[in-house]
Amino acid sequence: MPRAIRGVLIECDPSIKSIIVSIDSANHDYIIEDLDDERVVVKENMVSMLKAKLEDRLKENLPPEEESGSE
């Protein structure tokens, strides 16, 4: 008998999608279906955890912001 899994459609830039695919590649816990370069369907109950991991990964990759003080 077929099983249904509730999912959420995520639309993002290809660069962000590649990070999401990279996060999922370890255990395949998040992605239900990889649709195209900008869209992916993610398990509904895993969206908040995926957001947290994505934010952590982005913080690692982005340079720290410089303070814009003119002293």
Swiss-Prot record:
Q: GO:BP terms for this protein?
A: nucleotide-excision repair, preincision complex assembly; transcription initiation at RNA polymerase II promoter
Keyword Metal-binding assigned to the entry: answer is no
Which compartments is it annotated to reside in? Nucleus
Domain of life of the native organism: Eukaryota
Please give the Pfam families that the UniProt record associates with this protein: Tfb5 (PF06331)
The protein's predominant localisation is nucleus
Q: Which GO terms describe its cellular component?
A: transcription factor TFIIH core complex; transcription factor TFIIH holo complex
Q: Does the keyword DNA repair apply?
A: yes
What does the UniProt keyword field contain?
Answer: DNA damage, DNA repair, Nucleus, Transcription, Transcription regulation
Q: What does this protein do?
A: Component of the general transcription and DNA repair factor IIH (TFIIH) core complex, which is involved in general and transcription-coupled nucleotide excision repair (NER) of damaged DNA and, when complexed to TFIIK, in RNA transcription by RNA polymerase II. In NER, TFIIH acts by opening DNA around the lesion to allow the excision of the damaged oligonucleotide and its replacement by a new DNA fragment. In transcription, TFIIH has an essential role in transcription initiation.
On subunit structure and binding partners, the annotation says:
Component of the 7-subunit TFIIH core complex composed of XPB/SSL2, XPD/RAD3, SSL1, TFB1, TFB2, TFB4 and TFB5, which is active in NER. The core complex associates with the 3-subunit CTD-kinase module TFIIK composed of CCL1, KIN28 and TFB3 to form the 10-subunit holoenzyme (holo-TFIIH) active in transcription.
Similarity comment? Belongs to the TFB5 family.
Please give the name of this protein: General transcription and DNA repair factor IIH subunit TFB5
The taxonomy runs: Eukaryota, Fungi, Dikarya, Ascomycota, Pezizomycotina
Point out the gene that encodes the protein.
TFB5
